[in-house]
């Protein structure tokens, strides 16, 4: 009843036909999927059997820690909070869903809040908007990453067994403790922490400096494949332009069953838009 979009009719080789149509859509991450129903109809127009595939589970459990460079060279800070706001609003945050914590570093490291501090998207967004830049004349990126690994991803602070750990590192300069970076990244690899690294080129552009060494360092922080885990933006204002791509790549980590999958779009099935009959089986889509 009331099916006006996507209705499919397919002839049954044994007589009669199959009629399909979508029922309703449900959201999983940033994407929407439609379930539907198909009915076998006899040559005398009697319904023989109805088939309605069950809705697949939408997996959105991730433990995400955002590691923010808050040193003096980040400017304006409002662009960082705008980036956080845009990224967080598209996450389904909760104790049984995605959890988010934020660490800020410069010369020292501060936990702004832990994975289990807040339990709704609104609470996390409000807390992120209240974060103030702590400053510092040095950029201790290795220290920031290692502190997040050691302290933020603990069960006491909300990390869950069996849930994918994700770290998002945002920085605008080469680290002053880069001699420790490889050791710290190796530890993250050992603990299966997926890392997305974002290089902000603003301070280099303002100072007319080469970005080559900086970009190479941030690429070394990102998980493999690098092209899926590394981003660079021209300045702080441009951070919001990568939110959609970053969000989709983060969500794909849990939503895809294949660890090497690059996209979530083909992972969830739909029914009601198409059908194909063979002698012994029916394919729905």
Swiss-Prot record:
Protein name: Integrin alpha-1
Top-rank lineage group of the source organism: Eukaryota
Extracellular side: 1-285
PANTHER family: COLLAGEN ALPHA, VWFA DOMAIN-CONTAINING PROTEIN
Cysteine-cysteine disulfides: none
Keyword Membrane: yes
Residue positions the entry lists as glycosylated: 2, 40, 208, 232
């Amino acid at each position: 009843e009331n099916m006006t979009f996507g209705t499919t009719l397919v002839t049954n080789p044994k007589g009669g036909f199959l009629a399909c149509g979508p029922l309703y859509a449900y959201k999983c991450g940033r994407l929407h999927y439609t379930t539907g129903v198909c009915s076998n109809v006899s040559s005398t127009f009697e319904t023989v059997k109805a088939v309605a595939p069950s809705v697949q589970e939408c997996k959105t459990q991730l433990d995400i820690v955002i590691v923010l460079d808050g040193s003096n060279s980040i400017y304006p800070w409002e662009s960082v909070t705008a980036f956080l706001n845009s990224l967080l609003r598209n996450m389904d945050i909760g104790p049984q869903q995605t959890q988010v914590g934020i660490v800020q570093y410069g010369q020292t490291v501060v936990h702004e809040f832990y994975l289990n501090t807040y339990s709704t998207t609104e609470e996390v967004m409000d807390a992120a908007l209240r974060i103030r830049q702590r400053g510092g004349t040095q950029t201790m990126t290795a220290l920031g990453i290692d502190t997040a690994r050691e302290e933020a991803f603990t069960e006491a602070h909300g990390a869950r067994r069996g849930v994918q750990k994700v770290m998002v590192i945002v920085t605008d300069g080469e680290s002053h403790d880069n001699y420790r970076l490889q050791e710290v990244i190796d530890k993250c690899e050992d603990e299966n922490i997926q890392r997305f690294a974002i290089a902000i080129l603003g301070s280099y552009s303002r100072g007319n400096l080469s970005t080559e060494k900086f970009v190479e360092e941030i690429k070394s922080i990102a998980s493999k494949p690098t092209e899926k885990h590394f981003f660079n933006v021209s300045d702080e204002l441009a951070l919001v332009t990568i939110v959609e791509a970053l969000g989709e790549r983060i969500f794909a980590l849990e939503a895809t069953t294949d660890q090497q999958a690059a996209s979530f779009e083909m992972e969830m099935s739909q029914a009601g838009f198409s059908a194909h009959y063979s002698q012994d089986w029916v394919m729905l889509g």
